[in-house]
Amino acid sequence: MADSPTIVDFLLTSPSHSRPFEADAHYLADGQPKPLVVFVHGFKGFKDWGHFNVLADYFAQQGFVFVKLNLSHNGVVPGGSGDLEDMEAFGHNNFSIELDDLGALLDALHQPGTTPLPATELDLGRLFLIGHSRGGGLVLLKAAEDPRVTAVAGWAPMSDYDQRWPAEVMRQWQANGVQYIENGRTGQRMPLYYQLAEDFQANRTRLDIPVNVRTKLRQPLLILHGDEDETLPLQMAHDLKSWKPDAEMVILPGANHAFGGGHPWPQHTLPEHAQEVADRTISFFKNLG
């Protein structure tokens, strides 16, 4: 039987705001430096959604330190239920906040003693990012601006924030100051305040995925997307590949947006497609040396 990973939980803060946010790390504690994977959830996601803890254990058993975080304004309250419950925080989230949250985590990992992770367990020269869905777009942007990142994997990644907003929706959103979306899983009515769009426009140079992938993303990139994705079109994967021709792209037949996962996930094994995504990502990272 495989060894059980050590799991440590910790709180983070960002210089961009005053809201603390949670992260955890799964690893086999052997005192040897291991490559580090940082995993970023997507829109309406959180670090303990579905099979993500099974995923973290699997990566740990394959020789990685696997760190995942709750982005600070994702709706999860530190010490709360673990699910989405703070709708005001959710509504005031934006892409700059998320990028800065991820940066705060990377900074903390590079400062011994800032997290409970022993420095002896970390090989910071092999720092990999994985992002799912909107988190996939986020890790592309972070890698483009942060040379500490060794390589990136996008799992059903968003390729462009801008094209998701039709002109009529934008007009109504600006006029009302807020739009609401429904969480199909919980039935919650979730606000998105117009500041999200304002932040994107004000920081477009930093937040424009197509431009940053074409001009600044130098690290190796793996793109994984299901051909039955019901949330983000498969064309997004092809777009990313066209902007970064040296990227490796894998289309998974029959895979949906969550690669077979759901919340809650009581099983102790990964969904079939999530297992394939994990294995392909592990091989990609390990082949980089």
Question: What does each model-identified segment do?
Answer:
Residues 1-31:
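N-terminal cap/lid segment of alpha/beta-hydrolase-fold proteins
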Residues 52, 219, 232-243, 264:
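Short alpha-helix in the alpha/beta-hydrolase fold that links the catalytic acid
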Residues 228-232, 257:
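Acidic catalytic loop of the alpha/beta-hydrolase fold
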